[in-house]
Amino acid sequence: SGHVSSAYDIALMSRELMLHHPDIQTYTTIWMDSVRGGSFGLNNTNKLIRFYQGATGLKTGYTSQAGHCLSATARRGQMHLVAVVLGADSSAERFSACRTMLDYGFANFSLLSPQVGENRVPVRLGQEKTVRAVPGGDTNLLLEKGVKPQVKIELEESVPAPVSQGQALGTMTVYEGENILLQVPMVAEKS
């Protein structure tokens, strides 16, 4: 009583589980199995595992208060999506709604990593004349298909030796129009 979660909460938990414990898919993708030497059969209640291309899990549920619920995950290529339905009137409705959301995501969005090219910063009094600057964080963006973001890289004019791997050298900002989609530090690739 008094414990509630939103679809967003469930999606965040599902995302974190899949990101940090991908081995869970060893179990969540099993359609049917048997245990105890074959004397007991198990069927996955997530029907998408059998019938949806790329399905990787995740969890079905039902209570009289919450209705039929599903956190569904699927991967196609490098894109892994989560769809959550809470409060469906029937089991079939939860699967249909998640299938529709996953189809929409795969049809209308793509994973993009901005191309940063070769970026070098001069090193003053160093053994090497320059150091290569690379993004210091994840640069993958889930964007609507057809969106062509702009990339702006701002680097220090020069840095004094010694330079340490991971040392901040500037910033990469990815825009769509006036909106900042991503900002990550540009760091030294090596010492």
Predicted feature residues:
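Domain-terminus/edge residues, biased toward the C-terminal soluble/receptor-binding domains
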Residues: 2-191
